[in-house]
């Protein structure tokens, strides 16, 4: 108990210092910041975007599933360079206010909300809380947000931010709709 009483405040102070250093580094970088969140699909979308955008731009992406405060902080401190043009930031949450906090930290220019589902229902307590939390990215994005209209919970979501809202999907009408998609043993096209 004594060790915990001594170590917890120290750990919090160190975290704050690391995050402050990451915030300062991010503020000094002129890169486009893209936040990606959702109950599922975050890592896949981030990885696909990183592959595509890296063909033309210098990109930094959070590795693996580094999608919480300290994972994002570590990525910014250790991997982001001033020459990076795009920062792809996966943002995960299993409690209320975590996406909002990450958005205040990263200050994304663009957001992508992949899907809303029942993951982390035990900690969020309701589907409404999950939807509200994931949509915090749409509320904090500065320029535009991409919303998956194939997801029944996102399809009619109310977004109060006056930025451009761009829909995407395969099954439902959308601004960007995947068509003629074929999948077989050799892959997809």
Show the residue positions of the predicted features.
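ATP-dependent carboxylate-amine ligase catalytic core
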Residues: 2-30, 51-132, 136
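Short beta-strand segments
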Residues: 35-37, 90, 114, 148
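Acidic, Mg2+-coordinating active-site environments of NTP-dependent enzymes
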Residues: 83, 113-189
């Amino acid at each position: 108990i004594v060790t915990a009483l001594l170590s917890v405040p120290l750990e919090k102070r160190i975290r704050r210092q690391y995050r402050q250093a990451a915030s300062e580094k991010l503020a000094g970088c002129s890169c486009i910041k893209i936040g990606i969140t959702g109950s599922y699909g975050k890592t896949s979308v981030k990885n696909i975007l990183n592959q595509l955008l890296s063909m033309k731009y210098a990109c930094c992406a959070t590795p693996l599933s580094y999608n919480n405060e300290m994972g994002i902080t570590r990525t910014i401190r250790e991997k982001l360079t001033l020459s990076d043009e795009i920062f792809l930031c996966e943002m995960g949450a299993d409690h209320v206010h975590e996406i909002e906090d990450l958005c205040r930290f990263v200050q994304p220019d663009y957001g992508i909300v992949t899907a809303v589902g029942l993951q982390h229902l035990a900690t969020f307590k309701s589907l409404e809380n999950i939807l509200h939390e994931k949509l915090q990215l749409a509320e904090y994005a500065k320029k535009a947000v991409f919303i998956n209209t194939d997801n029944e919970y996102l399809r009619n979501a109310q977004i109060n931010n006056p930025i451009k809202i761009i829909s995407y999907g395969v099954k439902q009408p959308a601004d960007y709709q995947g068509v003629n998609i074929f999948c077989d043993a050799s892959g997809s096209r």
